[in-house]
């Protein structure tokens, strides 16, 4: 059975620290779904550091090189010589294109296992999984059983997703109409409010796929929006409320403030005026509590049914919070 190998070199989103003896960095070989994957950590050559008592130099891993190999039932086709002495790579390209998905899947899985180890075992900051659109995943170097490079591998360009291109979670484009505001901001910058900062953090977490953090940031943002509107910090009432809340003498739920308390204070009830968005805020806080107490991204609806939370639902909650922000500003 002919041996086929694909070599992927994947650059990391953040450098991972390594303190290793002078010899070459470690390699790990492991099976995955019928394939053999050799992982080599690629070390930076432009810097290293060594404290007085350190036995080895410290540097960073900036890439992971994975060689994925398998025994195939069929051999790669030879490159065809055309009558005009040109090389026809198409048969070999088609062969390698058909083989790519399983080799690619192994490279993604093993590389992300390495990154998970650094993120959660060694607590390396800013580590992100290798995305499926990474160009290197689609353009490996192929080798036959003799270690000879196969020239039929295609060069594929994969478009990187642009967060917010379709306007998700309030993303807007700079247009001629917005340009005067940019000019003004450059001359007179303004610090964003705490609520806006929290909303932005929730948005970033959502685009990163960190839904737990997005939910927590949204819930905190909602509390800040509501309590600062009802109990202005600069007012005696606000100072009194903060004191009593800090001393655990008073506990007022956001949902109560948005219904009966709002109707008493402002003759308007968010629950009555925006029932769908009010329900979204309710579910947001139920999920926040589930995360805080059990770490689970879910909540129970009014019928006691457990509901798993996905990106679409968090997007709905984000829109409800922005709707609530606008409603509060009108009071």
Residues covered by each model-derived region:
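Basic/polar, acidic-poor N-terminal "presequence/leader" segments
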Residues: 85-155, 300-311, 315, 329-330
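Charge-enriched, short contiguous segments at helix-coil
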Residues: 48-60, 76, 84-100, 268-331
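Charge-rich, solvent-exposed alpha-helical interaction surfaces
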Residues: 99, 106, 113, 243, ...
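Helix-loop junctions and short alpha-helical segments
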Residues: 129-271
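Long, contiguous, compositionally biased segments that the model treats as domain-scale units
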Residues: 1-125
């Amino acid at each position: 059975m002919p041996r086929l190998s694909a070599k992927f070199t994947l650059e990391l989103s953040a450098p991972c620290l390594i303190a290793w003896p002078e010899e070459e960095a470690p390699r790990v070989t492991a099976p995955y779904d019928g394939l053999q994957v050799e992982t080599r950590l690629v070390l930076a050559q432009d810097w290293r550091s060594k404290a007085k008592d350190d036995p080895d130099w410290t540097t960073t891993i900036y890439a992971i090189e994975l060689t994925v190999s398998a025994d195939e039932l069929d051999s790669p086709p030879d490159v065809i010589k055309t009558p005009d002495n040109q090389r026809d790579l198409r048969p070999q390209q088609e062969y390698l294109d058909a083989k790519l998905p399983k080799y690619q899947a192994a490279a993604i899985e093993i590389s992300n296992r390495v990154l998970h180890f650094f993120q959660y075992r060694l607590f390396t900051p800013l580590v992100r999984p290798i995305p499926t659109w990474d160009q290197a995943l689609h353009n490996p170097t192929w080798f036959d059983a003799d270690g000879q490079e196969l020239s039929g591998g295609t060069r594929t360009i994969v478009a990187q997703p642009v967060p917010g291109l379709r306007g998700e979670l309030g993303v807007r484009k700079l247009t001629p109409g917005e340009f005067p505001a940019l000019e003004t901001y450059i001359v007179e910058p303004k610090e964003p409010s705490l609520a806006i900062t929290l909303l932005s953090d929730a948005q970033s977490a959502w685009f990163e796929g960190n839904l737990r953090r997005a939910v927590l940031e949204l819930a905190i943002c909602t509390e800040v929006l509501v309590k600062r509107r009802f109990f202005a910090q600069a007012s005696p009432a606000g100072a009194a409320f903060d004191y009593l809340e800090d001393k655990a003498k008073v506990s007022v739920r956001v949902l109560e403030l948005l219904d009966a308390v709002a109707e008493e204070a402002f003759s308007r009830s968010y629950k009555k005026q925006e029932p769908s968005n009010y329900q979204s805020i309710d579910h947001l806080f139920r999920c926040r509590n589930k995360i805080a107490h059990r770490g689970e991204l879910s909540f129970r609806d009014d019928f006691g049914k457990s509901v798993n939370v996905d990106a679409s639902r968090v997007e709905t909650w984000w829109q409800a919070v922005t709707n609530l922000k606008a409603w509060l500003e009108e009071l």
